[in-house]
Amino acid sequence: MNPFAISVLTAPKGMTHLFYVGQAGFIVKSKSGQTLALDLYLSDCGERFEGHIGFKRLLPRILSPQEVIFDYIIATHPHFDHYDVDSMPFLMSNPHTRLYASVDCKQFVDQAALDEKRITYVKPGNTCHAGDFLLHFINCDHGTLAPDAVGVIIEVDGKRIMVAGDTCLRLDRKDEYLSKGSLDVMIAPINGAYGNLNEDDCAELSKVLSPELTIPCHYGLFATHGGLPGLFMEIMREKCPDNDYLLMTMGESIIL
């Protein structure tokens, strides 16, 4: 078993844990021990899907889909690094696991003949009760690449985590992002490709929303995806020096 899987499984109860799996993938473990996985990319299917080396995985996998049974899974849109078609059948193999997926993920659900009774298709404005987690799905502007993509505000153990999802900068949606209250954590991409926020955009969003902690993601795994964490640091220091941020390495966890 991978050491990272062991760290997830043995993370003590009584605390809220946030783990980084790489790319846009995160795991939240509640105080009672329930687990929520978000946009996990655990395979090498990207290079096969896209047909060129620009989507070759450049960092090793730290988790196999068979190693951890998740209570809940979120797939914000059907791109391979958010809905991993190779891994999802394994992730959903336990009859206890539930999936919350954007409506355009259904094609892959049908292809894999997953159990529809354990799947909820979500749109912006939907709220779902998932055990210890309250999930508020929000608008996500990923353009024509994924018109039904969603972001999500996760409420757990008195904490509020906003995952912006794959989106461009939409400051006009500030009220939506803060509709449930102030944010403890904001997670957003910095790669600046395929319609996503770049380093400056992420810093600007952090400045406007003023979360307690900003965590950039969506960089470092593919040669074609871009994203410079060093540049993000420089911009944060200039644009919003009072905002705390954290660059998480794959396998790292924090207590919220």
Predicted feature residues:
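Zn-dependent metallo-beta-lactamase
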Residues: 1-46, 50-53, 231-238, 242, ...
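Pre-active-site segment of Zn-dependent metallo-hydrolases
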Residues: 10, 31-74, 86-90, 167-180
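Beta-strand-turn-beta hairpins that frame and shape the catalytic cleft
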Residues: 11-16, 29-36, 127-136, 155-161, ...
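Active-site metal-binding loops of divalent metal-dependent hydrolases
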Residues: 39-43, 78, 140-141, 165-167, ...
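Metallo-beta-lactamase
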Residues: 70-81, 214
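Short internal beta-strands
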Residues: 97-104, 213-218
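Binuclear metal-ion centers of metallo-dependent hydrolases, dominated by the metallo-beta-lactamase
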Residues: 113-128, 176-179, 203-256
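Active-site-proximal loop/helix segments of hydrolase catalytic cores
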Residues: 141-208
